[in-house]
């Protein structure tokens, strides 16, 4: 410390004498000087340094120090005289320490030289002594240029001359060349390595010049020489903290705190480091220890007060004298209230840092950062506040669920009303910053009413004094998705010019966007862009607002700009990284320290601790659950009140439900790896994005293309499932219903493909596909959507999937026929040989179950519950297979299976119709010798079909029977009889569908017979528009 004062005095005196024409060193000297410094930099390379006080961050992986460089160093620093082996070794160790080299152990000799023995005073060469004398004289007369030149000459001839380096540094300091001064003193310190005070001067100067690495090294040398130099430990710890070396900074402050646990500044720094190191609970514990110590002290004061009257006057007088010698540093209020107690004894036994409102404010912030102990935080803050206000006896407030003790609501409390007047007159108001933090904790527990009660106290304060608290409350409300309330606290900030920034415009615009006030949102997003035109996130949000305002041109234009700017920013980042090294290499050499900061090992922030991740997960899950429940309730109300009759109303419903489904789909736990695949529908479950901005650009790009893409999760996430029946506030059955309803509504009102993608996502969810009933429902919903598509292959695949899963199920077989009742795609599927082979294998599988034997070519048995003791056949399988054979013109084969059906269901109209048509078509193929007999046989079945329809069915089926019989006669050329049945269709029934077909066929017959007038009449009556 004395050396530091000496340097300052010397600087002040010399500065007064310094002439105005003091110039820079000549070019030759400067070149020589920096040439030397470059040599020294090469010498100060990074190897392992053995001293435990020197930080390991200074250890670099370089080549080992070799003997050639040792020799060159000695040659440069040689005084042209013989030097002892010990002198050589000591000096080399000093240079190795300067460059973080490993210090070599001294060789043992037979002389028994003791370790650490002082070396003899060096004898200077006469020439060097003469130059040094001349340099000192020039320095004294303030001829700094001459002095600098002479000292450089001294260093050339005697590179180990401490005085030359030290005084040369003084000259640079007077000239304002502080970096050169620091470098010179740094070398001088190595030549006088045992002077820790000089090391400290160099360390402080290095820190002032922001030469962090060099400053840390110098402070480490100070601490290694004087482990009790607490200022150096403090300064080095602050440098560690600055460079992100949290573990080393924490170690330093822990040592300081152990040495002086009553320094509030050290306590605060240690608490901050604990927070930075993700040890928030340790920070809270520090302040709780201080609080408990204060509680214990107050209890001791109250106990001592009872015995104060028994103490002697002499003892009190002695204590008064001692008190005069050492004034108390804290608890002045206690001394004023209780002046007669034995304060000497209290201070000696119960010394502690005072716990006041400032300490409580810090404690409240720590509980906010902890995020998982809001309830405990609220209780602790209330307890501490009562203690500060000397109301610690009012413990009944601990059982009050709200914070009414701090406002006028306390007068409604019966227990408070029964207190003594002295207790009621005590202070109950808390500082506004603590009240706001208490409100933030309440908000984190989803107690919005109590939180707003605290925030509204801001209205009673001078606005300019608490503007930052307005912003803090508004930001927290935005984070909690209470957008309308957040607007109330953001809006007043606009009246202050210093708050009209992007930090306010951006969240305020988001709030207006969320409440669908898009015009106002657009205004604030535009203001934010004026403040920060390169912020792409704001531009993306504004583009989305234009989309919501039905301005597609501006939306697409902004989106193109954002994409281009994003590419440009990525290119700029890569270019900047590639140029960093070259820019560092070309920096001015005169501004570099000997130990360059660029050689620091790159600091990597430590990974998040499991505790930190768990805390964030709990907080996030709580917010998501509240959002899910809220949206679900809104969706239910909308469904009940508005219905889904209009496409516009359906779109609103779809938007709400899509957000819920996206939240569910983001949970990676639900998707088995073996079943996961890329998903390209409205729910992008497998695509991952590097940043939120990339996701937003991708999503808006889909909107620009007209796709139905809704905002969803950014990336897959893994969630700890704590319940087997629900997720995020909804039961799995409710989630399943949302998926199914959403798929059907989207398929109906928007896009069949998007509706199908929702079902496919649900089929990949393990909690769904492990439930047989849900699996059945998903397959039928998917079939219902596929039926709206004109995709023959997709329909056939889904039908086969159903038939395989629900093997031999008659309802599923009915669904198969219902699904293929119209259109050319249905006929193509029925006539496909693939379907014929599929059902033949199913028939064989059924027969194997029926006769309890293996059948060659049968399908695998998936239905293990087939019970057929009477060995009955399956009419559904026979009928479907017969239809497939009939559709592919295999009439004879079809008749074989239809004949088997006739035995079981002789009065089924469709069996008789198919048998009749099969006989007729077989006869028309001219592949039988008795064609006319087969036609008669076919007509017999057709008349039976007609009779069954006429006697047992409605007019619609009767009309169908007349038409089919007429069409059969038309086929075999008996047109007069065909016309009779066609006329029945035209005249006896009201339904017009078959009338058009009957009229068209009648027109063909009349035209062939030459009756054009009657044909025109039918054309005009039935086929004209």
UniProtKB/Swiss-Prot annotation:
Q: How does it assemble?
A: Component of the TFIIIC complex composed of TFC1, TFC3, TFC4, TFC6, TFC7 and TFC8. The subunits are organized in two globular domains, tauA and tauB, connected by a proteolysis-sensitive and flexible linker. Interacts with TFC1, TFC3, TFC6, TFIIIB subunits BRF1 and BDP1, and with RNA polymerase III subunit RPC10.
Q: Which residues carry this modification: Phosphoserine?
A: 311
Q: Which organism is it from?
A: Saccharomyces cerevisiae (strain ATCC 204508 / S288c)
Where would you find this protein in the cell? Nucleus
InterPro entries xref list: Tfc4/TFIIIC-102/Sfc4 (IPR039340), TPR-like_helical_dom_sf (IPR011990), TPR_rpt (IPR019734)
Q: What is the effect of changing residue 162 to S?
A: In PCF1-139; increases RNA polymerase III gene transcription
Q: Which UniProt keywords apply?
A: DNA-binding, Nucleus, Phosphoprotein, Repeat, TPR repeat, Transcription, Transcription regulation
Recorded GO cellular component terms are: cytoplasm; nucleoplasm; nucleus; transcription factor TFIIIC complex
Q: What does this protein do?
A: TFIIIC mediates tRNA and 5S RNA gene activation by binding to intragenic promoter elements. Upstream of the transcription start site, TFIIIC assembles the initiation complex TFIIIB-TFIIIC-tDNA, which is sufficient for RNA polymerase III recruitment and function. Part of the tauA domain of TFIIIC that binds boxA DNA promoter sites of tRNA and similar genes. TFC4 is the TFIIIB-assembling subunit of TFIIIC and essential for viability.
Q: Which GO terms describe its biological process?
A: 5S class rRNA transcription by RNA polymerase III; transcription by RNA polymerase III; transcription initiation at RNA polymerase III promoter
Where the TPR repeats fall, as residue ranges, is: 128-161, 162-195, 196-229, 230-263, 264-297, 432-465, 467-501, 502-535, 536-569, 875-908, 959-992
Record annotation: effect of changing residue 280 to T: In strain: SK1
UniProt region (Sufficient to bind BDP1), positions on chain: 128-569
Protein's recorded name: Transcription factor tau 131 kDa subunit
Q: What is the effect of changing residue 469 to K?
A: RNA polymerase III defective. Defect in the recruitment of BRF1 into TFIIIB-TFIIIC-DNA complexes and diminished direct interaction between TFC4 and BRF1
The answer to whether keyword Repeat applies is yes
Q: Where is the composition biased (Acidic residues)?
A: 46-65, 311-325
* Basic and acidic residues bias locations: 1-26
> Where in this protein does the record put region Disordered?
1-71, 309-334
Impact of changing residue 728 to G on the protein? In PCF1-7; increases RNA polymerase III transcription
Mention any additional remark.
Present with 876 molecules/cell in log phase SD medium.
Q: Describe its PTM?
A: Phosphorylated.
- Which PANTHER family does the record match to this protein? GENERAL TRANSCRIPTION FACTOR 3C POLYPEPTIDE 3 (PTHR23082:SF0), TRANSCRIPTION INITIATION FACTOR IIIC TFIIIC , POLYPEPTIDE 3-RELATED (PTHR23082)
- Indicate the impact reported for residue 190 to Y: In PCF1-1; affects the rate of recruitment of TFIIIB to the template. Increases the amount of transcriptionally active TFIIIB. Increases RNA polymerase III gene transcription
């Amino acid at each position: 410390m004395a050396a530091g004062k000496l340097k300052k005095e010397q600087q002040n005196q010399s500065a007064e004498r310094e002439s105005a024409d003091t110039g820079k060193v000549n070019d030759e000297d400067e070149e020589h000087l920096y040439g030397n410094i470059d040599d020294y930099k090469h010498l100060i390379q990074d190897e392992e340094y053995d001293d435990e006080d020197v930080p390991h961050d200074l250890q670099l992986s370089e080549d080992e120090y070799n003997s050639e460089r040792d020799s060159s160093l000695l040659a440069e620093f040689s005084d042209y005289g013989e030097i002892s082996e010990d002198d050589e070794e000591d000096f080399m160790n000093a240079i190795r320490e300067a460059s973080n080299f490993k210090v070599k152990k001294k060789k043992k000799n037979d002389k028994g030289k003791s370790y650490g023995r002082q070396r003899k005073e060096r004898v200077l060469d006469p020439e060097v002594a003469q130059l040094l004398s001349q340099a000192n004289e020039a320095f004294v007369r303030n001829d700094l240029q001459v002095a600098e030149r002479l000292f450089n000459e001294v260093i050339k001839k005697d590179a180990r001359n401490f005085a030359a380096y030290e005084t040369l540094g003084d000259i640079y300091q007077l000239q304002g060349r502080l970096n050169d001064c620091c470098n010179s003193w740094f070398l001088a310190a190595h030549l006088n390595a045992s002077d820790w005070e000089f090391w400290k001067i160099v360390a402080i100067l290095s820190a002032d010049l922001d030469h962090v690495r060099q400053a840390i090294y110098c402070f480490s040398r100070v601490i290694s020489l004087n482990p009790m130099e607490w200022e150096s430990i403090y300064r080095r710890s602050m440098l560690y903290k600055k460079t992100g070396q949290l573990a080393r900074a924490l170690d330093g402050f822990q040592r300081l705190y152990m040495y002086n646990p009553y320094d509030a500044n050290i306590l605060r720094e240690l608490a901050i480091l604990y927070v930075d190191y993700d040890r928030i609970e340790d920070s809270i514990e520090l302040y709780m220890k201080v609080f408990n110590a204060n509680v214990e002290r107050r209890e001791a004061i109250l106990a001592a007060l009872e015995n104060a009257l028994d103490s002697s006057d002499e003892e009190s007088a002695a204590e008064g004298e001692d008190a005069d010698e050492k004034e108390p540093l804290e608890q002045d209020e206690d001394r004023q209230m209780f002046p007669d107690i034995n304060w000497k004894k209290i201070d000696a036994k119960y010394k502690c840092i005072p716990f006041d409102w400032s300490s409580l404010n810090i404690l409240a912030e720590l509980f906010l950062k902890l995020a998982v102990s809001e309830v405990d935080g609220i209780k602790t803050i209330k307890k501490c506040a009562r203690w500060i206000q000397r109301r610690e006896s009012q413990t009944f407030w601990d059982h009050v669920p709200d914070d009414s003790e701090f406002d006028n609501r306390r007068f409604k409390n019966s227990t408070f009303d029964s207190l003594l007047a002295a207790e009621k007159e005590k202070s109950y108001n808390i500082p506004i910053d603590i009240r706001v933090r208490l409100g933030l904790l309440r908000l984190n527990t989803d107690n919005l009413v109590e939180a707003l009660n605290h925030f509204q106290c801001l209205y009673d304060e001078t606005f300019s004094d608490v503007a930052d608290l307005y912003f803090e409350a508004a930001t927290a409300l935005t984070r909690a998705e209470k957008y309308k309330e957040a607007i109330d606290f953001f809006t007043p900030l606009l009246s202050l010019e210093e708050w009209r920034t992007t930090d306010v415009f951006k969240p305020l615009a988001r709030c207006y966007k969320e409440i669908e006030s898009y015009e106002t949102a657009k205004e604030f997003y535009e203001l934010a862009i004026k403040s920060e035109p390169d912020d792409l996130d704001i531009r993306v949000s504004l583009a989305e607002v234009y989309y919501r305002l039905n301005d597609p041109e501006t939306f697409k234009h902004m989106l193109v700009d954002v994409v281009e700017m994003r590419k440009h920013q990525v290119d700029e980042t890569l270019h900047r990284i590639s140029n960093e090294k070259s820019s560092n290499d070309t920096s001015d050499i005169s501004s570099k320290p000997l130990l360059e900061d660029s050689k620091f090992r790159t600091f990597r922030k430590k990974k998040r601790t499991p505790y930190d991740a768990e805390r964030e997960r709990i907080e996030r899950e709580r917010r998501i659950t509240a959002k899910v429940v809220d949206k679900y309730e809104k969706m239910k109300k909308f469904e009940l009140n508005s219905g889904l009759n209009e496409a516009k109303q359906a779109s609103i419903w779809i938007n709400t439900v899509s957000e819920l489904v996206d939240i569910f789909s983001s949970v990676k736990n639900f998707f088995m790896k073996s079943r996961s695949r890329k998903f390209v529908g409205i729910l992008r479950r497998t695509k991952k994005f590097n940043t939120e901005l990339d996701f937003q650009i991708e999503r808006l790009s889909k909107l620009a293309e007209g796709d139905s893409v809704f905002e969803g999760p950014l990336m897959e996430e893994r969630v700890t499932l704590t319940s087997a029946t629900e997720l995020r506030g909804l039961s799995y059955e409710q989630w399943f219903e949302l998926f199914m309803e959403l798929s059907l509504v989207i398929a109906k009102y928007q896009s069949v493909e998007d509706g199908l993608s929702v079902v496919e996502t649900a089929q990949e969810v393990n909690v769904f596909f492990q439930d047989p009933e849900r699996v059945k429902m998903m397959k039928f919903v998917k079939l219902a959507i596929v039926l709206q598509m004109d995709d023959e292959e997709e329909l056939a695949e889904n039908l086969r999937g159903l038939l395989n899963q629900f093997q031999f199920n008659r309802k599923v077989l009915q669904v198969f026929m219902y699904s293929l009742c119209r259109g050319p795609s249905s006929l193509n599927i029925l006539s496909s040989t693939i379907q014929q082979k599929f059902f033949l294998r199913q028939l064989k599988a059924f027969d194997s179950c029926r006769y309890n034997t293996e059948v060659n070519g049968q399908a695998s048995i998936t239905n293990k519950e087939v019970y057929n003791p009477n060995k009955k056949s399956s009419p559904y399988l026979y009928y479907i297979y017969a239809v497939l054979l009939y559709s592919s013109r295999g009439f004879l084969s079809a008749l074989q299976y239809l004949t088997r059906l006739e035995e079981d269901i002789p009065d089924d109209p469709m069996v008789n119709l198919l048998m009749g048509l099969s006989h007729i078509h077989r006869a028309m193929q001219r592949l039988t010798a008795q064609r006319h007999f087969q036609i008669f046989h076919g007509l017999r079945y057709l008349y039976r079909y007609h009779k069954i329809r006429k006697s047992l069915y409605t007019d619609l089926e009767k009309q169908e029977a007349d038409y089919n019989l007429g069409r059969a006669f038309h086929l075999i050329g008996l047109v007069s009889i065909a016309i009779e049945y066609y006329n029945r269709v035209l005249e006896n029934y009201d339904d017009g569908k078959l009338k058009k077909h009957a009229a068209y066929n009648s027109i063909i017959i009349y035209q062939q017979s030459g009756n054009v007038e009657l044909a025109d009449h039918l054309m005009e009556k039935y086929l004209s528009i």
